[in-house]
UniProtKB/Swiss-Prot annotation:
Cell compartments where the protein resides: Cytoplasm
UniProt GO BP: translational termination
Keyword Ligase: no
Main location (coarse class): cytoplasm
Domain of life: Bacteria
Function statement: Responsible for the release of ribosomes from messenger RNA at the termination of protein biosynthesis. May increase the efficiency of translation by recycling ribosomes from one round of translation to another.
Family annotation (PANTHER family): MITOCHONDRIAL RIBOSOME RECYCLING FACTOR PSEUDO 1, RIBOSOME RECYCLING FACTOR
Source species taxonomy: Bacteria, Pseudomonadati, Bacteroidota, Cytophagia, Cytophagales
Gene name of the record: frr
Identification of the protein by name: Ribosome-recycling factor
Pfam families assigned to the protein according to its UniProt record, in alphabetical order: RRF
Amino acid sequence: MEEINLYLDDAKDSMQKAIKHTELELSKIRAGKASPNMFDGIMVDYYGSSTPLAQVATVSVPEPRSITIKAYEKSMVTTIEKAIRDANMGFNPQNDGDVIRINVPPLTEERRRDLVKQTKAEGESGKVRIRKIRQETNDELKKLLKDGASEDEVKRAEEVVQALTNDTSAKLEALIAAKEKELMTV
């Protein structure tokens, strides 16, 4: 039935988006080495409006444990420095007037454990999104029974949704395990 395929495609797309979202969130968790992605969530006050750091400066990694941030406008350097300090990322930015330099300290064992907890929480959030998508799709499929779809078709579609859920959950588990390994590798 055409409608069933639409619901299955929609569920697949939504689950892929949930994976992508979790990947993005996990990329923001720093693993001891410098990465421009670490600053994706930082918002800077740009003439009264909250603007992502990437839109007001370039973030580069000249060495594995250092980051340089060059503002597009010189007047923004102190504002960017303040935004980084306010983000409580554990960095001590040095402002030399033109460029902000940040040395990325190695992670302590305690900080690594905290980041693993954060990773697990993000992973659990992704799993909840996937289960919610499964539930919504199954609810829509059950409504089709009232609209004249056969029980066999709906049952098969529910099995496909469950297989899709299992597959997506396995991908999510692999992402989480890889991030945990990355965090705990000294």
